[in-house]
From Swiss-Prot:
It comes from Acidovorax ebreus (strain TPSY). One of its GO terms (biological process) is protoporphyrinogen IX biosynthetic process. Pfam families: Aminotran_3. One of its GO terms (cellular component) is cytoplasm. Its cofactor is pyridoxal 5'-phosphate. The lineage of its organism: Bacteria, Pseudomonadati, Pseudomonadota, Betaproteobacteria, Burkholderiales. It is found in: Cytoplasm. Pathway: Porphyrin-containing compound metabolism; protoporphyrin-IX biosynthesis; 5-aminolevulinate from L-glutamyl-tRNA(Glu): step 2/2. The gene is hemL. This is Glutamate-1-semialdehyde 2,1-aminomutase. The modification N6-(pyridoxal phosphate)lysine is found at residue 274.
Amino acid sequence: MTHNTDLNLPLFERAKALIPGGVNSPVRAFRAVGGTPRFITRAQGAYMWDANGQRFIDYIGSWGPMILGHGHPAVLEAVQKAALEGFSFGAPTEREVELAEEIIRHVPSMEMIRLVSSGTEAGMSAIRLARGATRRNKIIKFNGCYHGHADSLLVKAGSGLATFGHATSAGVPQEVVQHTLVLEYNDVAQLEEAFTLHGPDVACVIMEPIAGNMNFVRASVPFMRRARELCTQHGALLVIDEVMTGFRVALGGAQSLYAQAIPGFKPDITVLGKVIGGGMPLAAFGGSRAVMEQLAPLGPVYQAGTLSGNPVATACGLATLREIAKPGFYDALGARTRALIDGLAGAASAAGVPFCGDTQGGMFGFFLLPQLPQNYPEVLNTDGMRFNTLFHGLLDGGVYIAPALYEAGFVSAAHTEQDIADTVAVARDVFQKL
């Protein structure tokens, strides 16, 4: 069913009168690309439908969690069964234990795990744990990496390595971020100098192994290796934020890929979210037993949550993880994702539009640039106006990618070869108009 008038617009007007910006997470407002956000009414498989009844091939996947696609039968069955048993108990359940066992089976660096309700909560708790375990205050993060909206992580770089960061949000006191040092991603020399200047005071280094809020930028193997070496040398903890990459790029997360290139590699703390909840509010952080036993009720680092380990969310996550652990899942997912980027690259090339892209598992990114950027300043060279035109052309053609230049995209197991072909066909027409 389609409509002659846009039903998304009056919904957006209603929302703006009640909700700041009309949305409950800023990127959904289409401020970066312009226009009216689509109000989604339902989703199934690889598709979403908006208030007008227009169908979209979905490459957002709820910003990553929907690795099986929307409405997978096994997940629906698990969620329905759990909901009938009770929405929330505020007490331990066997399913929490089963989910922890499933995660730890595939991510062996996580000897113990704590379930929470959001990636922000997991990242915030990981930082507190690192500080409590090391009895140090300073943290190192990287320009362009996003770890949730916790105060100490909403930081931009200072004027040099001797200075600490400045808050990127109103409401965050400078005193909160004064212990956060922001460096350029993939810059080994900066990282070494930072440890030379501040090593004894650094509690942790936190990084995304693939920076999905720079669209798609990988940590180089030398950079990751040196981060691990410097943390070990100075007694700091290496925190790998796999909220986006965990179970999305490989069954063992991105860290399993680095372990293939760096013998013995493992982080001290891992942060997970998105896929482990299968679309429900669920995240986790975990690490070595020695570090995790610093958490209450065993240790002095306090962390708690009313809905942590929610029985319906854990049922959803557990069903999802069991499906993606089946043989051949990631081979098929990775091939489909690669086919998408190769097809888009061919369409751009035929139109003479600069294009480069990268994929890992079911995660992808692309830039309207001749070569892949390695850090945030290089990402900023992308032509934003051209991207906005591309975005709206794809959207009008029934292809839904992230409404922001710097966001990664996601392919699910529900996407078919025909979906990829249809997407490339729409893109081919749009690229010709750029």
